[in-house]
């Protein structure tokens, strides 16, 4: 049975985990790291770079590097590159493809099934967009799971009955959830959050501060310089991380820009106190969702048994202090890695769905109320927020006008009394109603939410039996054929990247063989007969000519031709050695060295030459 993985698709970093012998293991990526930056870049040669390699070249390729795409999920955001238009689902699919490849490399088998996590406060369209991203990446998405729920699953599977508060502050989103755990049941009691609050916002405050300081000191506005701004973003992130363990840091960026007088350098000190002042209002925004969760769950602070911090941003001392203050002095649990716990929980849920993990029941909730617009623009709720899913609710509605031939069902998600102030998820029409006075027809509207938090709506005229259904997937939803087209496109990119890697390997092997053969001939000049030497040198010359071009097939053919000549010079050299009494053992033949080199070849992510020559931030 193919194994399923758990994926934490984060705003700034992503993680993939798998169950091995019933225990979750975080998979190390091709670069040797346990987290992969959620960054996608298009190199000058059209190659798609993902992760650390994409992040490293961002300074010299600002316009073609995309980060924090998770903040655009469920929207109509698009970016045009090389004559093609890309949406958030496609960008996320590139990241998921990279995680899928890393998992396949680690496991030595194909990976198709996955559980993907989303912020608890993601609405219907954001969840659907995440599911579509997985499908485009070639994954069968078994379940969309809320991040705090996954974290609680990872933390509390073996714990006794207890109440857990999960405080999840990531790179771009913030959630607070209250869960009850006991007897293998993980039940979410309440959840709240802010989908546009995270570590990126703390970074941006430092960037704004540095731009202001530099303008005051040099009269130059760095916000107008894209490359300088990218260097500032990277420096701001590093400064934020350093200030979690130090009380002061220095941000030093030489040659950040130039003026008429010459190059200008940025050199600023930033203390933890200054940093906390710059970001005090962001910290305050964490308070309201916390209080809402406690209120919705109807519990006292003293009833919370454990506090679990999730997301890299919770490493900031001010955040940890805030959580301690909000929970009445309770210390957060230090037994989980905030970067990895969500992916671990996702892999456990994947194990539950595949039958590898027994006796575990995950009861999640819908984060926002769902309803329809009724007369006067009022939001009539059918499903209240924090309702356990999957669930189904229905209500009877009627017409507002005499002889009304149809009714329009407009579906909304949110907490406001006026429908227009909430998030509109979709609409459809039930037509063919027989003429009748207003208030007479009986129309049953049913909401059905599946375990992924994705909703299906049906409207039925009880008089005629006519019915209309739809899956509410929000404005971002893609038609099935569009998802299939994007999946084929993503596979095409993967094939192109594979071809590029193969071409690079062929070139590397050819160049290595030229070097080793020429060295071997030089070192054994007196032991190789002139006719054999001439034959080999001719083949090497042909290979060198082919290496000047770009035809990989010709390079491979020329390489094999040289390899085919090697046994002859090796045999002649061995004969010469045997005839020379007391001769010391010689060096490896180039064929042997090449074979050894081939054993050591690993897949490398190729980056464009321009990046290498220009270099990154100093």
Swiss-Prot record:
Sequence ranges of Basic and acidic residues compositional bias: 489-505
Chain positions with Phosphothreonine modification: 173
Low complexity bias (residue ranges): 577-594
InterPro entries hit by this protein: ATPase_NBD, Chaperone_DnaK, Heat_shock_70_CS, HSP70_C_sf, HSP70_peptide-bd_sf, Hsp_70_fam
Induction (free text): By stress conditions e.g. heat shock.
Region (Disordered): 489-512, 577-618
MF annotations from Gene Ontology: ATP binding; ATP-dependent protein folding chaperone; unfolded protein binding
PROSITE patterns: HSP70_1, HSP70_2, HSP70_3
UniProt KW keywords: ATP-binding, Chaperone, Nucleotide-binding, Phosphoprotein, Stress response
A Pfam family of this chain: HSP70
Segments of skewed composition (Acidic residues): 600-610
NCBIfam families: PRK00290.1 (NF001413), prok_dnaK (TIGR02350)
General function of this protein: Acts as a chaperone.
HAMAP family: DnaK
Family of this protein: Belongs to the heat shock protein 70 family.
Name listed for the protein in its UniProt record: Chaperone protein DnaK
Protein source organism: Streptomyces griseus
Phylogenetic lineage: Bacteria, Bacillati, Actinomycetota, Actinomycetes, Kitasatosporales
